[in-house]
Amino acid sequence: VCATGHTLERSFTNNMLLVSHRGNLFGPEEETENSPAKIAEVINQGFDVEIDVWSIDNKIYIGHDKPTHLITTDFLLRPKLWCHAKNIEALEHLLNIGAHCFWHESDHYTITSNRFIWTYPGKQLTPRSVIVCHTKKETDMVLSTNAYGVCSDYVGYCK
């Protein structure tokens, strides 16, 4: 069992892990995504959440295109978070505190700190893959694969 509480022993097609992209469930909501309140709400509904993490001047923030919301280290250690480091300082901090994290830009695959394979859309899947899907159609299609999970703005439709 890893820090997010997941193991690889599971039923893939009927029990795929659903990871909300930045706290979105039914499509992008730029006004609320990556906000602490939205993330807590989505976790309370039973979803995992991918968040974008920045470190600027030894302070930790979340936000997609820029550091927006100042947060605490305790926030990052919540179960069900997948922390996407947006700069090297954030990656170093996340690794130092033991948060579940990863770094990628345009890679087809990247390994998370808990040994999952963060997978770019349309790439080959494995039982360790968590695939990123950009549309509801992509999200629906991946549900019948052997992927461990799916990260999308549309995972609310999958429950």
Show the residue positions of the predicted features.
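Phosphate-group recognition and catalysis centered on beta-loop-alpha active-site segments
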Residues: C2, T7, F12-K159
